[in-house]
Every structure is written in structure tokens, then in C-alpha cells.
């Protein structure tokens, strides 16, 4: 992250103020203040983590993935009891993404659910959409299979199984 000396001074002052206003996290803010004041570029990369960016296409892809799960859950509700018994109900739960490798996406999902009020039926579970394993590639394969289904919001048990297995 490139900053002028004036920008570094302003940010340093912000961290100082935060350390005074939030005593519980004072050590964290003092550390960040030191990094900015002294210009430790390796550690300044940490500051960039907070300012990630998801493109419009990436946002739409995440919404499509969540919509696919919504469609699968609604389709499952419409199945006859006998057909529903063929579907692994646990696989209908949207797990989210891996906070370690897909953090920006996890934060976006949380934003959509918590701030935007979308998909209130999704169970946050204990991990609040942190699947604890990378999921994006799996979801992409599932999305491709789902898009090939003729009736995406009225899936049969076989189609659900095919999507899960993608």
C-alpha cells in the first residue's frame, strides 16, 4: 500500500484515537500505528486485507450460488415424501465459504444475509457461513449442473443428487 507521509500521519492519528476509544483492542491499534508511522511495508500489507474488493461479476456469482441453494431447498419442499427420502437433507444446507482462503466471499455472504436481509432461511450455524474448507470451485461445478436443469426451481430428487455430486 503506497501512502504519502501526510496520509500516514492521518492514519497514525486514527489508530492513536482508536487505541484511546477502544481500550480492549488498544494493543492492536498501537501496533498498527507503529507500522504506519515507521513505514514497515511488509506489515503494511496487512492493512490491505481490510480493503478487499469483489467485482460485480464475483458478487453476481455468489448471489447465483445462494439462489441455487434457495431453489434446491424450495424444490425439496415440493417433493413427495417418498422422493424426499432419497435426498440427503444435510446437503441442502448452504455451508458458506472458507474464511481462511475465501474471506472476502464469506464477508459478502454475511453482508447479504445480515445487512440486506436476503436468504433468511439459510442456517448460519455455529460458524456463520464459514465452511472451514474451500468451496468456490465445488459451488461452480454445482452451479453449472443446476443451470443445465430444465426447471431450476422445481428439481426432482435425481437432479438434486446430480447437483450435489457435481
From Swiss-Prot:
Family, as annotated: Belongs to the UPF0304 family.
InterPro entries membership: UPF0304_YfbU (IPR005587), YfbU_alpha-helical_sf (IPR023146), YfbU_helix-hairpin_sf (IPR023145)
Alphabetical list of NCBIfam families matching this protein: PRK05445.1
Organism, as annotated: Vibrio atlanticus (strain LGP32) (Vibrio splendidus (strain Mel32))
Protein name: UPF0304 protein VS_1049
Top-level taxon of origin: Bacteria
Ranges annotated as spanning the membrane: none
Amino acid at each position: 500500500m503506497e501512502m504519502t507521509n501526510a496520509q500516514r500521519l492521518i492514519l497514525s492519528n486514527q489508530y492513536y484515537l482508536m487505541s484511546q476509544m477502544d481500550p480492549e483492542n488498544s494493543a492492536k491499534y498501537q501496533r498498527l500505528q507503529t507500522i504506519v508511522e515507521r513505514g514497515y511495508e511488509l506489515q503494511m500489507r496487512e492493512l490491505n486485507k481490510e480493503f478487499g474488493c469483489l467485482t460485480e461479476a464475483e458478487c453476481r456469482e455468489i448471489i447465483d450460488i445462494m439462489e441455487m441453494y434457495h431453489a434446491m431447498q424450495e424444490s425439496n419442499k415440493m417433493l413427495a415424501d417418498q422422493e424426499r427420502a432419497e435426498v440427503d437433507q444435510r446437503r441442502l444446507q448452504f455451508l458458506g465459504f472458507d474464511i481462511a482462503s475465501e474471506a472476502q466471499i464469506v464477508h459478502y455472504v454475511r453482508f447479504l444475509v445480515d445487512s440486506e436481509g436476503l436468504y433468511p432461511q439459510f442456517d448460519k450455524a455455529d460458524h456463520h457461513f464459514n465452511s472451514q474448507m474451500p468451496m468456490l470451485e465445488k459451488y461452480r461445478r454445482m452451479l453449472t449442473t443446476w443451470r443445465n436443469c430444465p426447471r431450476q426451481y422445481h428439481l426432482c430428487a435425481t437432479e438434486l443428487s446430480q447437483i450435489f455430486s457435481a
